[in-house]
Amino acid sequence: MKVRASVKKMCEKCRVIRRHGRVMVICSNPKHKQRQG
């Protein structure tokens, strides 16, 4: 899980979603998981 100021899709499988007011990226590749914070 990477915590970043700006979250971006790193591949075509990445999905940008909102959970509990946070912007997150979920992906089949665990290295691409990101959270805004």
From Swiss-Prot:
Keyword Magnesium set for record: no
Cellular component, GO, one term: cytoplasm
Disulfides per UniProt: none
HAMAP family: Ribosomal_bL36 (MF_00251)
Alphabetized SUPFAM superfamilies for the sequence: Ribosomal protein L36
Name of the featured protein: Large ribosomal subunit protein bL36
Keywords assigned: Ribonucleoprotein, Ribosomal protein
GO MF term set: structural constituent of ribosome
UniProt KW Nucleus keyword: no
